[in-house]
Design a protein with these regions (language model features):
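The feature captures the beta-strand-to-loop junction immediately N-terminal to the Walker
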Residues: 36-38
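Catalytic Walker B motif of ABC-type/P-loop ATPase nucleotide-binding domains
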Residues: 167-171
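Conserved ABC ATPase "signature" region
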Residues: 105, 120-138
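Helix-to-loop junction immediately C-terminal to a conserved catalytic motif
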Residues: 51
Length: 238
């Protein structure tokens, strides 16, 4: 599979604190890449660098190169980045008691004012995304009335309507019970997109990811298939 994303010698410091230290890896088109490691290892920080969300952090010192389709990430506009990356952050509460349709519509590109009239094409796009995540029946329900697994599927549907080629998820199964953890990851890995996600549960990482990056203290300890990374020898040193 050809590389879609390339990270070379990436380091990130904020003031005098090292967040990431000399990380290099590639992501192939269509790959499901899991990022694992203990709390504070730099997993979410790495996602922020990949998606160019850390450029305005105070005290920021960033070195190395991130390229997307052979183009340096800093050369992309915010609009172009949204066309390439769809981000599902760790589960957050809705600011307003919006219904499912309104939340999913927030993913439309270009962004539209909330409660504005959507075109027929937009409505079809939203309906298709909800169908993919199995929530066609819930479009008028309040987000806050849904289960944790259903809420996460709504956020994935919102990402899908962007039409981006890379789905980036930060702990997509956080705070979900075992049934919904598997439901979400089966969904994510069936979408035929390039997927980059942080994963806390090593069993889930082994089952659903093509490849794993093991981080510790901001450094890349191991990069490879789950059977290479998830060894007792490696994990005992973390």
């Amino acid at each position: 599979m050809p590389n879609l994303l390339s990270i070379e010698n990436l380091s990130w410091q904020v003031f005098d604190k090292t967040i990431l230290n000399n990380i290099s890896f590639n992501v192939a088109r269509g790959e499901v890449l899991g990022i694992i490691g203990p709390n504070g290892a730099g997993k979410t920080s790495l996602l922020r660098c990949i998606t160019h969300q850390n450029s305005h952090v105070r005290g920021n010192k960033l070195s190395g190169v991130v390229t997307l389709e052979n183009r340096i990430i800093s050369q992309y506009s915010a609009k172009e980045l949204a066309q390439h990356f769809a981000l599902v952050a760790q589960k957050t509460e809705a600011i307003f008691s919006l219904n499912v349709y309104d939340i999913v519509s927030m993913g439309l590109l270009p962004p539209k004012p909330l409660f504005s009239m959507d075109s027929t094409a937009d409505k079809n796009n939203i309906s298709k995304a909800l169908e993919v995540v199995g929530l066609s029946h819930a479009l008028s329900q309040s987000f806050n009335d849904l289960s944790g697994g259903e809420q996460q599927r709504v956020l994935i549907a919102r990402a899908l309507v962007q039409g981006s080629q890379i789905l980036v998820l930060d702990e997509p199964t956080n705070h979900l019970d075992v049934y919904y953890q598997h439901q979400i990851l089966r969904l994510v890995t069936s979408l035929q997109l390039t997927v980059i996600m942080t994963v806390h549960d090593l069993n889930l990482a082994s089952q659903y990811c093509h490849r794993l990056l093991l981080l510790n203290k901001g450094a890349l300890v191991c990069d490879g298939p789950p059977e290479k990374v998830l060894t007792s020898e490696l994990l005992s040193n973390i």
